[in-house]
Structure formats: C-alpha cells, structure tokens
C-alpha cells in the first residue's frame, strides 16, 4: 500500500510540474529582464512562497483573473530557476548567489536554506572576501553573518591578498564601523586595515571622513596615530586633517583605574593576583587569581585585557606559557606559547601586537625578541637585541620600544618575598646601555648611555620625553632619582630630581602628567607621585587589610 502511495504522490507531483509546460489555466504572468514573460499558476506559487501567498490573497489582486508580477530587478535565469523550483523541477547551482537574493525577496525559506548550505560548503579562507562582496547587503541571513565572521577573524592575513586590495568602499566601511563585540577590532588595527586599503584604492574626501569618524582617535595608540597623521591620502583632504587636529588634544590618555599585578602572601605566595586600584580613594578590589605557581613573569594590558607571560616556578627554571584574563568577566584564556622560555623580562604593547624582549632562559640571558599579534596562532622572532639583557626598564613611545639598563648576567632565583629586590653587589653585571627598537623598520638603535648601571628601573614616557626612576648610591646612602631624556634633542640624560627616602620598589606609571610609584608591602600601600611640570613630590601611606607584594602596575582606560 505504501508503494502505491509513493507512486501516486510522484504522479501528482509530475502532473503539477507539467502544468508549467502545458501553459494552460495560467493566472499569473511574471515579467523578467529583456521583456521576457513566464506564465504560472497562483496556487502553486503561493504554496511555496510567502511573498506570493500574501500578494495573491490581497483583496484587490485576488479579484484579478490574471495578475502581473514584475521581477525585472533580479537576474532572469535566477527567476526562471526559482519558478522551476516551485514546480518541483531540478535547478542549477551555477547562479546560486542570484537565486539566494531572489528567494530571500520572495520569502521561499526552503530554497534560502538550500542556497545557504551550498554557499557554506564553498566558502573558505580564500573565498570569504569574494563571497561577502556579493552578499554583504543581506546581513540578516545567517550565512552572510557566517561569512562576515570568517572574514573578520582572518583579516590579519586577508589584508595582504588581492581580494582585499579590490574590496569596495562599502565593505571597508562595514568592517571598520562594526560595533558587534563578536568581531570588534581595536582602534589601532582599524588604522592598519584602512591604511592597507588606501595603498590600492581611491577614496573621496567624504568617504574618508566617514571612515575616520568610526575610529576613536583619542584612544589610539601612538604608533597608529603617527601612521594616520602621516598618510599622504589623508593629508590631501582639509576636512580630514581638521578632524584629526580636533581629536589630537588629548595626547596623553589618563587611566581611569590601575591594574595591580601582585602576589598574595596571605594565601598562596606563588599565585599571581590581579587587583583593580582606584587612584583617588587608594582602594582596590581583587578580580582574579591565576591558578599557576609562577613568579618573575611579565605582564601587560592589551585593550583592557591582562596578559601574563613566562616566569618561573621551582619546578621549571623558565616558562613560555601565555595567558589572557578579561577584566570584566574574569575569564582566563591560554594564548599560543612564546617561542622562547623567559623570566625577568618585559612585555611591550603597540597597537594589538605584544613584544617579548630578552630575559632569562634557564641560566642563559636572552638577546632574542619575539612578537605576537592578537588573533594569530603563533609568535614570530624579530631581530636580536645588540646585547643580552634581563631585568631592564622599558617603555613605549610612538613606534619605538625603549630599553634602559638591565642585567647582562644570570641572576639567581629569589624567594617570592624578595621578588622586588635584586642585590646588585652579588653576581650581577648591570648595564648602563640605552637602546630602542623601531617596530616599523625592525631595527635596533643605540642611544646615549644612562648615568650608571641600573636594574629594573621604572621607565615612563610623557609627550616627547623618557623618564627613568631608579636608586643611585652615593658615599652616604641611596637616593631615589628621576632622570629625563628628550627624544627630539638627543642631548643625553638630565637629572630632574632626587628624594632622600628610598622607595623599596619602583613600580611606576604615568597618570595625569604625574609619575606615580606604588608599592604594596605587608599591610601598607605606599603611593609616591612626582609632577613633571611642577616638579613637586607627594608621599602617601595607606594601611589595608591584605598583604601583597606588587609585581607590576598596568593602566585600565
């Protein structure tokens, strides 16, 4: 009986399909391009299309003996294919994009799903830009969101392809202006995308102004800002220049809070502990504890996410693990490991690229430098430093990474309670060298030597100046000194100020034209500040409940 039903069903379907060829009892005429017409039946079209069903049941149209439908805006072969589909005919996949657009317009859900499945099988890293070009206006369809997600996640490599070079302005604007957190880019990388596209395409003044308005210029890193201001195309248009000038006022961005990377001596002395610190009230809250027993690691902030890299514990002389901690949701994610094991080193951040420089690898001191761009699957090595260094001071200014002082010999491992102190008189060779790495041209440069050899000095940049905070020994005692170097004049290092009270740990950060030095010890928070304009010191001591040993200070914007 079931076999007879199947035969009967196929016969009925075949009879309905044959109605299209018989050209009888037709009550709808579809006009397509070149003036061609397709005769069809309202009932059959309405059964498969919500669009046709709604149209044909409208009272005014329902009274018509023959209804005319204009679909000349679509590819005529696509329309023919869709009519064939509604009559249960086999259709070609040659023009699947055009069929999808027309099927979406006619609200034929089954055909849309079939087209999406076919396109998904065809779409990959190499074809996603081309596919998005054809479909970006249909972002409401799931397959288009899928293609966009693939494009956005692979942009670091796609911007070097011919397909990206030929991308139309609308696609570029769509990429840079997106505010969806799933594929939201950092401001600096938006600049990278824009400048790469401008190398191969013409853009009008109005279009460029629209793109620039999608970039948060004031919160742009210095390297990206420099590249943006010096671009020839941007400098062709007065309104774009004025837009950048208007947004240049706040060059030194003030952190709204600080992130303190510490060790909690009250619980587990080897676990890094992340605190958020209110600068004005001197109050803090613990947001995360990393479940890894490490000390002398490096830390940095990338787009308000904390990066913890390297370090060592008493089972491993040095590590290459890298972790990312989201400040808001406190989720820990493991990133690709560094190529080299490192401890007693620093992480520099320019745009969304992290640079791991020197440090100790076992009993060796490294000259190597490697970098990782957020979203990549691995680190890559860059040109070596002129000398091997660990426990140096470091800061970033524009496209340069400045390295001051450091140890050229292996430093023995210290207990967690002594993690901030290094005895410079025991088996250490301190450097007074000052070098910088040009991240645009990938070269190292030598600058005037520092006054003396120094280990772990505090280093910050302010406008065109580099400030170094360090301890200097004289015949009587040890003083905390601040030195300045102007990157425009190259006149060497100037002693700015000294203070008699030695700061036991020089964790420094720039905040509102002030060099701030924080130190947690036992149950006290010490906060010392020096204003670079007024040259005034301010010393504050605040008691708190927990015992922390501070490891680093990071800005939260």
Swiss-Prot record:
Coiled coil: none
BACK domain mapped to chain residues: 143-223
Cell compartments where the protein resides: Host cytoplasm
PANTHER family: KELCH-LIKE PROTEIN 32, LD33804P
Subunit field text: Interacts (via BTB domain) with host CUL3.
Keywords: Host cytoplasm, Host-virus interaction, Kelch repeat, Modulation of host E3 ubiquitin ligases by virus, Modulation of host ubiquitin pathway by virus, Repeat, Ubl conjugation pathway
Recorded superkingdom: Viruses
One GO term (biological process): symbiont-mediated perturbation of host ubiquitin-like protein modification
InterPro entries the UniProt entry points to: BACK (IPR011705), BTB/POZ_dom (IPR000210), Kelch-typ_b-propeller (IPR015915), Kelch_1 (IPR006652), SKP1/BTB/POZ_sf (IPR011333)
Domain comment as written in the entry: The BTB domain is responsible for the interaction with CUL3 while the Kelch repeat domains supposely serve to recruit the cellular substrates.
The organism of origin for this protein: Cowpox virus (strain Brighton Red) (CPV)
Gene3D superfamilies according to UniProt: Kelch-type beta propeller, Potassium Channel Kv1.1, Chain A
Name of the protein described by the UniProt record: Kelch repeat and BTB domain-containing protein 2
GO CC annotation terms, alphabetical: host cell cytoplasm
Pfam families listed in its UniProt record: BACK, BTB, Kelch_1, Kelch_6
Reported function: Probable substrate-specific adapter of CUL3-containing E3 ubiquitin-protein ligases which mediate the ubiquitination and subsequent proteasomal degradation of host target proteins.
Gene that this polypeptide is encoded by: KBTB2
Limits of the BTB domain: 26-95
Ranges for the Kelch repeats: 305-352, 353-399, 415-464
């Amino acid at each position: 009986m079931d076999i007879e039903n199947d035969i009967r069903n196929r016969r009925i379907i075949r009879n309905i399909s044959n109605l299209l060829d018989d050209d009888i009892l037709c009550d709808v005429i579809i006009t397509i391009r070149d003036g061609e017409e397709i005769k069809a039946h309202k009932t059959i079209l309405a059964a498969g299309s919500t669009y046709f069903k709604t149209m044909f049941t409208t009272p005014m149209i329902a009274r018509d003996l023959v209804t005319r439908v204009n679909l000349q805006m679509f590819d005529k072969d696509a329309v023919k294919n869709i009519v064939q589909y509604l009559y249960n005919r086999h259709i070609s996949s040659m023009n699947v994009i055009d069929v999808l657009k027309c099927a979406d317009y006619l609200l034929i859900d089954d055909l849309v799903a079939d087209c999406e499945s076919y396109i998904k099988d065809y779409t990959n890293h190499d074809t996603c830009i081309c596919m998005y070009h054809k479909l970006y206006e249909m972002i409401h369809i799931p397959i288009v969101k899928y293609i966009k997600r693939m494009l956005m996640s692979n942009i670091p490599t796609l911007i070097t392809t011919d397909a990206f070079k030929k991308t139309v302005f609308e696609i570029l604007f769509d990429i840079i202006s997106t505010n969806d957190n799933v594929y939201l880019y950092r401001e600096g990388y938006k600049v990278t995308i824009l400048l790469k596209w401008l190398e191969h395409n013409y853009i009008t003044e109005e279009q460029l102004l629209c793109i620039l308005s999608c970039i948060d210029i004031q919160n742009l890193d210095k390297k990206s800002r420099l590249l943006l201001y010096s671009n020839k195309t941007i400098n062709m248009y007065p309104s774009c220049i004025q837009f950048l000038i208007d947004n240049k006022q706040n060059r030194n961005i003030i952190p709204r809070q600080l992130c303190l990377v510490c060790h909690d001596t009250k619980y587990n002395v080897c676990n890094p502990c992340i605190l958020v610190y209110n600068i004005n009230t001197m109050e803090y809250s613990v947001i995360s504890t990393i479940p890894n027993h490490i000390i002398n690691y490096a830390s940095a902030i990338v787009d308000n996410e904390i990066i913890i890299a390297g370090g060592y514990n008493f089972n491993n002389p040095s590590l290459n693990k890298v972790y990312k901690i989201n400040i808001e949701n406190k989720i820990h994610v493991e990133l690709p490991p560094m190529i080299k094991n490192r401890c007693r080193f620093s992480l520099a951040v320019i745009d969304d690229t992290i640079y791991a420089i020197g440090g100790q690898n076992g009993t060796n001191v490294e000259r190597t430098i490697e970098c990782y761009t957020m979203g990549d699957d691995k680190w890559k090595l860059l040109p070596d430093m002129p000398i091997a260094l660990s426990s140096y001071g470091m800061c970033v200014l524009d496209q340069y990474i400045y390295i001051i002082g450091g140890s050229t010999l292996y430093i023995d491992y210290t207990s967690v309670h002594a993690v901030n102190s290094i005895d410079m008189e025991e088996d250490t060779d301190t450097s007074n060298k000052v070098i910088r790495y040009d991240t645009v041209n990938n070269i190292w440069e030598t600058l005037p030597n520092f006054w003396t050899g120094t280990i772990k000095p505090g280093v910050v940049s302010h406008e065109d100046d580099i400030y170094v905070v360090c301890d200097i020994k004289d015949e009587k005692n040890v003083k905390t000194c601040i030195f300045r170097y102007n990157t425009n004049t190259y006149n060497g290092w100037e002693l700015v100020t000294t203070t008699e009270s030695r700061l036991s740990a020089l964790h420094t950060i720039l905040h509102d034209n002030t060099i701030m030095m924080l130190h947690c010890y036992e149950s006290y928070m010490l906060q010392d500040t020096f204003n670079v304009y007024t040259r005034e010191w301010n010393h504050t001591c605040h008691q708190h409940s927990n015992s922390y040993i501070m490891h680093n200070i990071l800005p939260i914007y």
